[in-house]
Amino acid sequence: MVDPASTQEQQAIGVLLQKVSNAMVALHKEQFGRGPTRAQSHFAGPDALLCVLEDTLLAAERRMVAMGEQQRVRESRMFLQVATADEFISTVETITGRTVRAFASAVDPDQNIVFENFAFEPDRRRDGDQAE
């Protein structure tokens, strides 16, 4: 028998992850002028979130990849992500209700995929009031 509480919790998590994915698409479009065509978000354990964004590169970046300049694409994306990190962090914190303690972005230019990674402060409600 399926536990209705567990099913409802899974549905709520699915809705939350969809909101994160939609927000990442919107942020990329706003910050970089183009949003990804596919986005998926997943919890990676209790205190981490991974967003996989596909088909994110700008036309000029795709041309750079064709020229063999993948490292330049990585470097320029890294600078852009550092400049916009606060927007990405605050958006995820608002949606999840969790405090982000670390954020990192990575790009695979050859596959045209960006990874947005968020590490949260431990959830004290889940962990109890255990001292560290």
Regions found by a protein language model. Give the residues of each.
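Interaction-mediating elements
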Residues: M1-E132
